[in-house]
């Protein structure tokens, strides 16, 4: 069972559904064990190489915090408490994988949107990186 779930969020409608699904999965753990599972929602702010890694990019951090407040309110509607965190990194994919390793999660649940690049469906760079390097199962929720 997935008692520790990491949900990276980017601000799409799929994030809302991914958080709801994560809450449902984490609540199922309570049936088997005495307490709910744990969910971490993270938003990764990509820092350009020209800037120091700990650079304060107020507008980007504010957007990430607003996004995390939004997903936290969705979790509250589902009667579930989640932890949120803003991560700053050069690359989004490695930051997600590192966070999964650090927290010892059992599942990464990512909401994705249907994107076309050059007329074909594209997952971008982040999702394939996470799928290839994740230490745990990954569920993609397509909106």
Give the location of each predicted region.
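Small/aliphatic-rich secondary-structure junction motif
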Residues: 1-55, 74-78, 83
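Solvent-exposed polar/charged
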Residues: 24-27, 101, 132
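Short glycine-rich, flexible loops that bind phosphorylated cofactors or substrates
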Residues: 14, 92, 116-118
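Short, solvent-exposed amphipathic alpha-helices that sit
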Residues: 21, 60-71, 95-97
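Short, flexible loop segments at boundaries between secondary-structure elements
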Residues: 133-143
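Short secondary-structure boundary segments
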Residues: 43-45, 111-113, 143
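Glycine-rich, Arg-bearing micro-motifs that act as flexible, cationic patches
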Residues: 110-132
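Structural beta-alpha unit
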Residues: 77-108
């Amino acid at each position: 069972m997935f008692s520790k779930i990491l949900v990276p969020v980017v601000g799409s409608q799929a994030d809302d559904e991914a958080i709801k699904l994560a809450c449902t999965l984490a609540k199922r753990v309570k049936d088997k064990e005495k307490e709910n599972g744990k969910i971490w929602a993270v938003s990764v702010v990509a820092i350009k190489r020209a800037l120091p890694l700990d650079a304060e990019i107020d507008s980007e951090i504010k957007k990430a915090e607003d996004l995390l407040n939004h997903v936290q309110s969705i979790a509250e509607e589902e009667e579930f408490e989640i932890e949120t965190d803003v991560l700053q990194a050069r690359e989004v994919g490695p930051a997600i994988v590192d966070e999964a390793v650090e927290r010892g999660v059992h599942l990464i649940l990512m909401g994705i949107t249907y994107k076309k690049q050059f007329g074909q469906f594209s997952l971008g760079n982040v999702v394939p990186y996470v799928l290839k390097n994740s230490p745990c199962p990954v569920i993609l929720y397509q909106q």
